[in-house]
Amino acid sequence: MASLIYRQLLTNSYSVDLHDEIEQIGSEKTQNVTVNPGPFAQTRYAPVNWGHGEINDSTTVELILDGPYQPTTFTPPIDYWILINSNTNGVVYESTNNSDFWTAVVAVEPHVSPVDRQYTVFGENKQFNVRNDSDKWKFLEMFRSSSQNEFYNRRTLTSDTKLVGILRYGGRIWTFHGETPRVNTDSSHNANLNDISIVIHSGFYIIPRSQECKCNEYINNGLPPIPNTRNVVPLSLSSRSIQYKRAQVNEDITISKTSLWKECTIIRDIIIRFKFGNSIVKLGGLGYKWSEISYKAANYQYNYLRDGEQVTAHTTCSVNGVNNFSYNGGFLPTDFSVSRYEVIKENSYVYVDYWDDSKAFRNMVYVRSLAANLNSVKCTGGSYDFSIPVGAWPVITGGAVSLHFAGVTLSTQFTDFVSLNSLRFRFSKTVDEPSFSILRTRTVNLYGLPAANPNNGNEYYEISGRFSLISLVPTNDDYQTPIMNSVTVRQDLERQLTDLREEFNSLSQEIAMSQLIDLALLPLDMFSMFSGIKSTIDLTKSMATSVMKKFRKSKLATSISEMTNSLSDAASSASRSVSIRSNISTISNWTNVSNDVSNVTNSLNDISTQTSTISKNLRLKEMITPTEGMSLDDISAAVLKTKIDMSTPIGKNTLPDIVPEASEKFIPKRSFRILKDDEVMEINTEGDVFAYKIDTLNEVPFDVNKFAELVTNSPVISAIIDFKTLKNLNDNYGITRIEALNLIKSNPNVLRDFINQNNPIIRNRIEQLILQCKL
C-alpha cells in the first residue's frame, strides 16, 4: 500500500548521487573568502599587532545602583526603590502626603532593653517605647493615618546590613519587613500619592524597580564593594538632572595602520526595536483543543535618526530556554485543553540580532573588544481568546517579564535576499507583575510571559544603548571585507522550505476523504510518488535519489537499526509480577528503550516517555512487517502525495527536505495494537495503554507479561480507529463482532464503507488524522 514508499526509502536510502553530494557541500559548508591582505597572506591570518582602543559613551544607560546621594527632601520618583544606608540610631526617614499617610522609620541598635526614647518626627517630639534583644539592627516603621492620631509600630525590619528601602509604585508605598537574609515586601495604600514627600536623614541610593531582585540582594546581603569604599563621595540629588555635553561619540577612530589593513574603534549609539513572533496551532475535531502556542523568530525593520543620519535597521528576535506549560480540562471531546503553550521565565533568554546600513556594519568580520551597554525593558502580555464553539471562551491574559542586557556577540542575520554580519544582544529575564491566568480555568496567578500575545498590541518594544568594538578593516575605505559565502544559498532554501511547509499545512482542510482512502490503497513507490510533479522523467529520477539521500539522515532511518535491540530490552525489563488497569497511565513498567538496560531502575518513573518511546519502535516493527490492513503510514503517505499534487510547482531542492520531515512529523499521535485470540492490547504515543475484548469492547487488565511476550513475535497493527473511537462507535451505533474485528485490523474496504455512509464518528477520526499531517 501507500506506506511502501517509506519501506522503499528505508531500503534504498543509502544510494548516493555524486552531483547531489557536491551540491550539498556547496550549500551547507561554509568557507571564508578574504581579500589579499598583502604581507599577511603568507600566514592566512589577520594581522596580530593589535593596538589599544578607547570606548566613549553617549546614550544614557540607567545604572542598577545609582548613588550615593546626600540626605535631602524630595518627592520620590515612581517605579524606583530608594535604598537608605542608615549609619546611626535615630530617625532614618519621614514620609507623608499630609492627608492620610504619615510614616517614620527609626533605627534601634542591637541589645537594647525596653526603654522610652524621644524622637523628632514631622517637627513634633514623640516618645516611642523601643526594644531590641537581637544581634542585628531593628528598623521600626511607625505609622498613623491622621495628624490627630498617635503613631504605632506597623512593621519591623531586622537587619545586619543597616539598609532600608521604600518604593512608590502602583498607587501604593512599598517597604521591606522581616529579618535578613529573608526579607519580604509589603505595601500601604494612600489616597493622594502625587503629593507625597520624603525626608531622608542618611545617604541613599536609587535603584529601578526592574532591578528589584538586585535591591532584594542588597537588603539581604549588603551593598557591593565599590559603593563602600572611602573614595566614593555622596553627591547632591540634583546631580541626576545635570545635562552632560560631550564631543561627537558616534565616530570611527583609527588606532593603527599596517600595509593594506588598519584597526578602527567603532562607537555607535543604537535604538533596538524588536517584536516577538508566535504560532498558535489548533487541533482538529470539535474545536475545543489547541495543539501548541509557541514562540518563533520575528523580523522587524525600521528607521531612526542617529546624529542627524537616517539609519535603516533590521532586527531578528528569537527565544531560547522556554518553559512548556499545558492545560487539560478533561478527556471528553468538548473539554477545553491546550497540549502545550510556551512561557518565558527567569531561566529563559531572548536574543535580538541587530544590523543597520551604517558604515559600522560594512566590515564586521575581524572584531575584538566588543562591548555594549543597554537599558532594560518590560514586556507585558496581552489577551488571547480561545474561541470554542459553545460556552464562554477561555481567555489567557497577563504575564510580564523584564529584559536585562546580559551580553553581546557577533552573529549572522538572514533576510529574504542576503545574509548580514550583525550583533546578537542577549537578554536575561526577571518575572514581573502582572501574573498570567487562563480565565474560566484552574490556571491562575502564574508568572512569566506566555506566547499567546507577547506583544500586547504593541508594534514593537524599544531599547536604547550603545556599543563599541575594534575592527580590522581594509585601509582603502572603498573595500569591504567579504563575509562567508554560500550561507545565503542555504538561507534561501530555508525560506522556500518555510513557504512550502505553510502551504502544505493549509492544504489539510482541502483533502477529500474518499480520495485519500483510495490513494492510501495504492502501492505508492518512489516513481509514482513524484510522478505528479510537472517535470521530466530524468528530473523525477534525480529527485527520488535526492530524497533517498536526505532520508538516510532522518530519525526514522537511523532508528531502524536499533529497533530490534530496543524492543528486546523493553520486553526483558518489564516486571514479571504486575497486571495493571489499562486506563491508568501511571502503571506502566516499561523502561525507556532509548536507554541502556543498566539504566532500567532509574528510568521507571518516566512512564509517559517510556510508553511513548515503545510506540515509536512499534511503528518501525509494523513498517518492516506488512499486514493486510491499512496503516497510519498509508494515510501519511497518501496525504503527502495529495499535497504534492495539489501544491504549487515544487523545486527539486525543497522536496528532498520535506519527505523525510513528513515521515517524522506526520500523525505524531499514533496508536498501535497487537491481537491475541479474542483480546486486543493497545498502546499510544501519549503513554496510555488499553486491553479489551473484541466481542464486547469491555476493558480487561493490561497484562505486562503477555504484552512483553507478544511484542517481539506478533504482528503490530496501526490503530487507525483507536479504542476510544471504537467504544464511542459501539455505544452510539452498535457494531457487530465482524465489523469490530475489521475495524481493529484496519480493513480498508470496511473503512471506506463507513466513510461512504457518512458515519460522523469514523469521519471525525480520519479528519483528525489528516489534520495531524502537519510540518
Swiss-Prot record:
GO terms for cellular component: host cell endoplasmic reticulum-Golgi intermediate compartment; host cell plasma membrane; host cell rough endoplasmic reticulum; host cytoskeleton; membrane; viral outer capsid. Residues 388-408 are annotated as: Hydrophobic. Keywords: Capsid protein, Coiled coil, Disulfide bond, Hemagglutinin, Host cell membrane, Host cytoplasm, Host cytoskeleton, Host endoplasmic reticulum, Host membrane, Host-virus interaction, Membrane, Outer capsid protein, Viral attachment to host cell, Viral penetration into host cytoplasm, Viral penetration via permeabilization of host membrane, Virion, Virus entry into host cell. Pfam families: Rota_VP4_MID, VP4_haemagglut, VP4_helical. Residues 509-775 are annotated as: Spike foot. Transmembrane segments: none annotated. A motif (KID motif) lies at residues 643-645. The keyword Coiled coil applies. GO terms for biological process: permeabilization of host organelle membrane involved in viral entry into host cell; virion attachment to host cell. Residues 483-510 form a coiled coil. Disulfide bonds join 317-379. It comes from the Viruses. Residues 247-478 are annotated as: Spike body and stalk (antigen domain). InterPro entries: ConA-like_dom_sf, Rota_A_VP4, Rota_VP4_MID, Rota_VP4_MID_sf, VP4_concanavalin-like, VP4_helical. SUPFAM superfamilies: Concanavalin A-like lectins/glucanases, VP4 membrane interaction domain. A motif (DGE motif) lies at residues 307-309. The record marks 230-231, 240-241, 246-247 as: Cleavage. Signal peptide: none annotated. Residues 65-223 are annotated as: Spike head. A motif (YGL motif) lies at residues 447-449. This strain probably does not use sialic acid to attach to the host cell. Belongs to the rotavirus VP4 family. This is Outer capsid protein VP4.
